């Protein structure tokens, strides 16, 4: 989720356009990034279709490396949602699958809506943007509300990815902000708060 917030800060409200031949997405008139396709949602029958399984669209093989890697990862890990060609969105939707891929690759994703569905793809070469301390609480809160996962492991990984030292339930931002996290006996977040240093 942190990568998604950072991406949103970069692209703002710009329109998007994908050039499959060039393997790139354009945002507005000034931003262009290489892409790797993940798959698409159909709003007609509420299903997900992996890009590697979308033979009818004759997608360029060079844009399918990531989704093919995800399929192989799913085979090794025994995750059917990564190996089945298509399935209902009630089983797993595009956001969940794209976030999983983002966690494995460290790249942000984009959901490109179109008439009847949406295309999901990863972006390469997006400049890294540090998440402001005041946004960290929002990211953690929204993530634990939207997705089932081990809170302790997820929070620890989040602070590590952001470069915040985290020990004893306290994360320290280099700029002086702190976030306090407490967990219950089942490893779920029971308390979450933070403080910002006074602005000079």
Give names to the regions the model predicted:
Residues 1-72:
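N-terminal leader/presequence regions that precede the main folded/catalytic core
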Residues 2-10, 91-103, 152-163, 170-173:
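Short, solvent-exposed secondary-structure boundary motifs
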Residues 16-22, 113-115, 166-169, 184-185:
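Short, ordered beta-strand-loop transition motifs
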Residues 25, 118-119, 181:
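Short non-domain terminal segments
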Residues 30, 116, 174-178:
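Glycine-centered tight beta-turn/hairpin loop motif at sheet-sheet or coil-to-beta transitions
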Residues 55-149:
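Surface-exposed beta-loop interaction hotspot
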Residues 132-200:
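Alpha-helical oligomerization segments
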